[in-house]
Amino acid sequence: MAKLLSFSDDSRSALERGVNSLADAVRVTIGPRGRNVVLEKKFGAPDIVNDGVTIAKEIELDDPFENLGAKLIQQVASKTKDKAGDGTTTATVLAQAMVHEGLRNVAAGASPIELRRGMEKAVAQLVEELAQLSQSVGGNAIHQVATVSSGGDQEVGRMVSEAMDKVSADGVITVEESKSLATELEVTEGMAFDRGYSSPYFVTDADRQICEFENALLLLTDRKISSVSDLVPILESLQKSGSPLVIIAEEVEGEALATLVVNKNRGVLQVAAVRAPSFGDRRKAALADIAVLTGGTVISEDRAMTLEKVSQDDLGQVRRITISKDNTTIVAKDENRDAVNARVASIKRELDETDSEYDREKLNERIAKLAGGVAVIKVGAPTETELKNRKLRIEDALNATRAAVEEGIVAGGGTTLLHLSKGLSKLAEQLNDDQRTGVEIVQRALSAPARQIAINAGENGDVVISEIQRLNKGFNAISSTYEDLLEAGILDATKVVRLALQDAVSIASMMVTTELVIADKPEPPAPAGDGGGDPMGGMGGMGGMGGMGGMGGMGGMGGMGMPGMM
C-alpha cells in the first residue's frame, strides 16, 4: 500500500488537530457537572455515556495524519484505564495541554530533545511530591472516592463502600445487570484467579474486551489439550443442549484451540479456554478448589481419567463467568455452600500442620479465595442506555477505590496538581533554557483539569484557577464554593493522579520530538458502474460465493471426529 508522508511543522500541526478533536470530545465529561456524549451504534439504540475512554475509542477521523494524533491520545486513555482503571479524562486533558504548549515552543525554535528532558524531570519531581502528599485510606474515604469517581453519585459510593466492607478491599467485586430497576448488592459464592482467555477470539464483549457467559459449564483438567479428538464427545453433547462451556486446563493449544475458535466464531458453540492457575501441585489444588466451588470433577492424570469419557455430570456449573485478558472471575451457584465450607475447614487443618511460611501464605490465599465470596453489584435503570452508563460509572468507582487502597488519596478536583505546580518553579531555575521551558510546559498544563472542571460547572475557568491559588483551597464544583477538598470528602486516588500525569507526559513528550508522520494513503472508492451497464449486474458475481461451499472442505476437520460441528 502506498504511503503519505508529512514532515516538520506540517506533521506536528496535523497531529495536534487530531489530538484536539478527540480531547475536545472527551473533556466535556470531566467533573461532577460533566456533560454526556451520545454515541451512535451500528445496531440498536445509541449509547449516552460519561466515560472518557469509551468516547475516545469511538473516534475515527477522515484525515489520516489527524487520525494518528487522535490514536496517540486514545493510547493515553487506554493505558491509564488499564493500569489505574480511572483517570482517563484527566490524562487526556493533561496530554492535550502539554501537546499544545510543547508544539508551540518547537515552532518557536526550541530544541525538542531538551524540551522532552525538561518535561521528564518535571514529572519525576511531581511523582515524588505526590507520594509525600498522599494519605492512607481510612474512615469514610472509600465511600468518598467512589462517589467522586462516579460523578458525585452518592448511591454508587455507598454501594461500592458496602461491597468492600463485605468482601474486603482485596475481595472479588463484580458488576452485572439487574432484572429490576433497583441497584442492589448481593454476596455469593465465587472466586477469581489471575489467568485469562487462551485466545482473544473468545471475546464476547468487544467494548470491554471480555468473554462472559451466564449459566456456563466448566471442564476442569490438569492435562494439556492439543488434539481435538479429546473434546469431540463433550462438545457434540453440549452443541445439542446449547450450554456455554469454559475449559480450564494446563494448556489448550494447536488443533484443539483452533477448532474451538472456529466453532465459537461460527456460532456453533459458546465456548472459551482458560489456562489453569498456579503451577505443579498448587495447580492441582487450585483446580480441586474450583471443582468444589462449582460441583465439578477434575479430569486428572493421577486418577487415570480421560477426556474422551467425560460426561456432563463431570462438569462444574456457574451462575456467571467473566474472563478478561489476564483474569477470570467465577460467580458460583449457592447449592455447593456446604462442600465449600468443608473444603475451607480441610485447608485450615492443613494450615495448622505446616511450618513453612511460604506454604502458610499460599494456603491462606486459597482460604481467602474460597471463603471470601464474590460481591455482585446488580445495576438497575429504567432504560438500557442509562443502565450501560450507570454500569460504566460503577466500574470506574470500583477501580478508583482499589487504586486508593493501593497508594492512598489526595485532594480531588484537579486541586492537587494545581498546587504542586508551584514547586516546579525552583526546578526550572536550575536548568538550561529549553529544559526550563520543558518544565514550564508541564507546569502550565497542570491547571488544565481544574480549569475544565470549572468550565463544565458553568464557571469562568481562569477566574476559578486564580481563586484556588489565592485562597490555597480547592473548588467544589457541586456547590460552586472554595473549601478544603480533603475535609469536604472530594478525593482522588493517588495512583490515578500519578498514572494520568505520567501517561500524559509520556505521549506529549514523544509528540514534541516527532519530525515525520507516515500514514496509509486512502484507497479511492471503487467506480459505481463497475458491474457493467446494470448497477445490480455486479451482484451476479456474488454467485461465485458458492465457491465458499468449498469451505465445507473444512469438513475435512470431520476426519478429526467433528463432522456435525463444522
UniProtKB/Swiss-Prot annotation:
Major location category of this protein: cytoplasm
Highest taxon listed in the record's lineage: Bacteria
Known catalytic reactions: ATP + H2O + a folded polypeptide = ADP + phosphate + an unfolded polypeptide
Location of the region described as Disordered in the Swiss-Prot/TrEMBL record: 520-540
EC number: 5.6.1.7
GO annotation, biological process: protein refolding
Record keywords, A-Z: ATP-binding, Chaperone, Cytoplasm, Isomerase, Nucleotide-binding
Binding site for ATP: 29-32, 86-90, 413, 492
Family recorded in the similarity comment: Belongs to the chaperonin (HSP60) family.
Disulfide bridges in this chain: none
Location of this chain's protein in the cell: Cytoplasm
Protein's job: Together with its co-chaperonin GroES, plays an essential role in assisting protein folding. The GroEL-GroES system forms a nano-cage that allows encapsulation of the non-native substrate proteins and provides a physical environment optimized to promote and accelerate protein folding.
UniProt cross-references to PROSITE patterns, sorted A to Z: CHAPERONINS_CPN60
Compositionally biased tracts (Gly residues): 529-540
UniProt xrefs under InterPro entries: Chaperonin_Cpn60_CS (IPR018370), Cpn60/GroEL (IPR001844), Cpn60/GroEL/TCP-1 (IPR002423), GroEL-like_apical_dom_sf (IPR027409), GROEL-like_equatorial_sf (IPR027413), TCP-1-like_intermed_sf (IPR027410)
Magnesium found in the keyword field: no
Family matches, as NCBIfam families: GroEL, PRK00013.1, PRK12849.1, PRK12850.1, PRK12851.1
GO molecular function, one term: ATP-dependent protein folding chaperone
Name of the protein described by the UniProt record: Chaperonin GroEL 1
